[in-house]
Amino acid sequence: MESKFAHIIVFFLLATSFETLMARKEIDGPEVIELLKEFDSNLMCEGKQMWPELIGVPTKLAKEIIEKENPSITNIPILLSGSPITLDYLCDRVRLFDNILGFVVQMPVVT
């Protein structure tokens, strides 16, 4: 019984000695806050970001609709469903995944 109690005490001592990953000290100052704001603003893209209504629509028509609804989208590759993709994020790209019949099978989103 004493062994379990000792383990619990050691666990709590270790847990209280670590800070959480998101914790920020007051001495970090406003510079850290400004950098975080700048980072967040870079992730925001302009215009419409997703088109759930285009699932089942012919791919070429879907491409025209996306170009019309968000002119900042200039890169719209058409890929066969299941194709490998890169994990980078670009505000000017929407990938269209279609099937062998030429219909959109996944929701187009800015990626």
From Swiss-Prot:
Lineage top rank: taxon: Eukaryota
Record Pfam families: potato_inhibit
Swiss-Prot/TrEMBL site (Reactive bond) positions: 87-88
Keywords assigned by UniProt, alphabetized: Protease inhibitor, Secreted, Serine protease inhibitor, Signal
Subcellular compartments: Secreted
Signal peptide (from-to): 1-23
PROSITE patterns linked to this entry: POTATO_INHIBITOR
Signals that turn on the gene: By wounding.
GO BP terms: response to wounding
Propeptide residue interval(s): 24-36
GO cellular component: extracellular region
Claim: Secreted is one of the keywords in the record: yes
Entry keyword annotation includes Secreted: yes
Coiled-coil ranges (or none): none
Principal location class: secreted
MF terms (GO), sorted A to Z: serine-type endopeptidase inhibitor activity
Alphabetized InterPro entries for the sequence: Prot_inh_pot1 (IPR000864), Prot_inh_pot1_sf (IPR036354)
Family in the record: Belongs to the protease inhibitor I13 (potato type I serine protease inhibitor) family.
Name recorded for this polypeptide: Wound-induced proteinase inhibitor 1
Lineage of origin: Eukaryota, Viridiplantae, Streptophyta, Embryophyta, Tracheophyta
